[in-house]
Design a protein with these regions (language model features):
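Histidine-acidic metal/acid-base catalytic patches
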Residues: 2-4, 9-11, 15-22, 56, ...
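N-terminal basic, low-complexity leaders that serve as flexible interaction/assembly modules and, when applicable
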Residues: 1-45, 52-53
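Generic structural motif recognizing short loop/turn segments at the entrances and edges of beta-strands
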Residues: 1, 127, 140-145, 224, ...
Length: 360
């Protein structure tokens, strides 16, 4: 396993800092990634190659790009003509990535935002983004959820990214559940099947792996505000992978924090999921983060203090032969670290320490 970092709109200064942290593997999380677009709005393989070589100039490899799937899943239910247009652009993006030398693309299955209901004070006064189903309301959803690359609470802490990207391109097609038109379980699975049918054959031919981020968070039975999260359990992840069970192009951005959110026993659940999906060789990258709490009641936290035994997770990745990257994700917010660079530095160091303490 290797230490990785994901960065939105990286600058020369920020990449220099990453190399000083000891990072050798980069994920660019920009969505949409304007630097890669051609005149038609699709990625240009030559621009991807240039970005890859730019990253390599800092001594790092560009392992993964974020594929902006826009609102294709929701559109496949409510606006099929627009879904077809997005699918056409995605096929071009996938081929361009292959042409530019980047062969893993991560993407998110969210149709609505990454639902949160507020903040909980944590260690030393930091604030951790939280989801407590009992406190859910459409108003808290709009105010506290992640929208695309936006981070909740950034307006209070001067974060380096938008506080609320809702309604902007950076929301990458995610909408308020109240304005989604609703998503039943059957519609959710139909949308995912549509996506897989539209893009996996192109990815297979291009030699590109698509790494899906599960639904964050798991919703209660019956969903929230008319929306079901069907990939919110190990069973759901298994069913999703079985939409193309033999395809090496079809795998996971295994968000360990999101998987932990699916259970009242998050540590055991994470280990079980790593064993199953790592054993199937369908984990293509990892969001190595922790939470406090579990199903329907959790808050984000530093990786060393949560409910998941992170050392046990490392041992399990080792056992199943996972040899990809571990990326920190979703650290708390604080006025003392408005860009969260120090907090991500802490998470990187903690991850490096575990990798060294638990060798292959």
């Amino acid at each position: 396993m290797e230490l990785g970092e994901q960065i939105i709109n990286p600058t020369e200064e920020r990449l220099r800092l990453s190399t000083q942290y000891g990072v050798e593997h980069l994920v660019i999380d920009s969505r949409p990634n304007q630097q890669l677009m051609g005149d038609d709005g699709a990625w240009d393989g030559r621009k991807i190659e240039a970005q890859r070589k730019w990253v390599e100039g800092f001594g790092m490899s560009l392992d993964v790009l974020a594929l902006d799937v826009d609102s294709i899943l929701l559109d496949s239910i409510h606006n099929p003509e627009r879904a077809r247009r997005v699918a056409d652009r995605l096929r071009k993006d996938i081929q361009a990535a292959a042409d530019g030398g980047v062969t893993t693309l991560k993407y998110n299955l969210q149709m609505v935002g990454i639902t949160r209901t507020g903040f909980i004070e944590g260690r030393g006064g930091v604030r951790g983004s939280a989801f407590q189903a009992r406190n859910y309301s459409p108003n808290s959803d709009e105010k506290f959820s992640y929208w695309g690359v936006g981070h909740p609470g950034a307006d209070q802490h001067g974060s380096d990214i938008a506080a609320n990207a809702l309604g902007t391109k950076e929301a990458v097609g995610q909408v308020l559940s109240a304005k989604s038109g609703g998503v039943t379980q059957q519609q959710g699975w139909d949308a995912l099947a549509y996506f897989v049918e539209q893009v996996i054959p192109t990815a297979e031919k291009a030699g590109v792996r698509l790494a899906a981020h599960p639904h964050d968070p798991a919703y209660p039975p019956g969903g929230l505000n008319g929306v079901e999260h069907v990939v919110g359990s190990i069973d759901g992840i298994r069913k999703f992978l079985d939409l193309a069970p033999e395809s090496v192009a079809h795998g996971l951005n295994f968000c360990q924090g999101t998987v932990a959110e699916m259970s009242e026993d998050p540590s055991a659940y994470v280990v079980e999921a790593i064993r199953e999906f790592g054993g199937r060789k369908r984990i293509y990258m990892v969001h190595f983060r922790n939470i406090k709490g579990g199903y329907l009641d959790f808050s984000e936290c530093f990786p060393d203090e949560g409910s998941v035994d992170m050392a046990a997770a490392i041992r399990t990745y080792r056992e199943v032969g996972y040899d990809g990257i571990l990326c920190p994700d979703h650290v708390p917010v604080s006025d003392l670290d408005p860009a969260r660079e120090r907090f991500f530095g802490f998470a990187l160091g903690y991850t490096r320490g575990l990798l060294q303490a638990i060798p292959a």
